[in-house]
A protein has these predicted regions:
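Non-catalytic nucleic-acid-binding interfaces of large nucleic-acid enzymes and RNP effectors
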Residues: 16
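Structured mid-to-C-terminal alpha-helical surface segments
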Residues: 4-13, 21-240
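Glycine-rich beta-strand-to-loop/alpha-helix junction loops that act as flexible
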Residues: 1
Length: 240
């Protein structure tokens, strides 16, 4: 939802909300209590929320946490969606205030959110860590769109630090040669290109964006981060 708002895709096909909590215990009982309290707020919009399931997110995901399936009801309409709640994410240098425009009301609300650099860093780490096994075309689209539409708002020094902090949080490190090989494989892989074409057909907002354009933008910018990271102490980039 945050990325959709940032790049101006108002009706993006997503049913996911990702959030992180600070200074609170993260377990099923407390997470349920928090979401129930939020859902009980009276806004006179007629929408009612019901938690349908709660479970722990296991280690195979990018981050451990709690996943909640929720059903929103408005008269006869029902809309399921999920909320993933994590804790102590490495937001570098820190959360920022973001004005989120509401869908059904002509106003915005203030929320604390990731800064652009941390948002990009998490997706870049996922792209490198998963390599050819990454089936989440949304990650590639998000990086491309943010790098192109918000380039003047991105600090590469902050992005480098955010990338390093994300890798440390997720306990990953990458050698220079490994980065180059992974990016070359991503760029040239016919399987990823086919998945991209399916993603493009299923999502109108992608328009006629080719895999070549997307992968080139991603490769160029991750290589730039790699170049910077090897020149700062405490880096997660390893020299071969």
């Amino acid at each position: 939802m945050l990325v959709a708002s940032i790049v101006g895709v108002d009706m993006r096909a997503t049913m996911d909300i990702d959030t992180t909590v600070k200074a609170l215990p993260l377990n099923e009982k407390d997470a349920r209590a928090i979401i129930e309290r939020i859902g009980e707020l009276q806004l006179e919009d007629g929408v009612k929320f019901k938690i349908t399931s709660v479970k722990e997110i296991m280690e195979e995901f990018d981050y451990p946490g709690i996943r909640m399936m929720i059903e929103a009801n408005l008269e006869r309409m029902r809309q399921p969606f999920k909320i993933d709640i994590s804790t102590d994410d490495a937001i570098t240098p820190g959360a920022v205030e973001y004005k989120y425009k509401l869908m059904f009301e002509d106003r915005s609300i203030s929320v604390l959110s990731y800064n652009l650099e941390t948002l990009l860093a998490e997706k870049m780490q996922t792209i490198l860590a998963r390599g050819l096994a990454n089936t989440r075309m949304r990650d590639f689209y998000d990086v491309y769109e943010i790098m192109n539409s918000k380039a003047d708002q991105i600090s590469f020094d902050v992005l480098k630090k955010a990338f390093a902090a994300t890798c440390m949080k997720r306990e990953t490190s990458f050698g220079e040669e490994e980065v180059g090989e992974t990016l070359d494989k991503i760029k040239d892989d016919s399987g990823l290109e086919e998945m991209w074409n399916r993603f493009k057909r299923a999502n109108y907002f992608v328009d006629d964006l080719s895999w070549g354009e997307v992968s080139e933008t991603i490769v160029d910018n991750i290589e730039k981060i790699s170049f910077l990271a090897t020149r700062f102490p405490g880096s997660v980039m390893k020299r071969e």
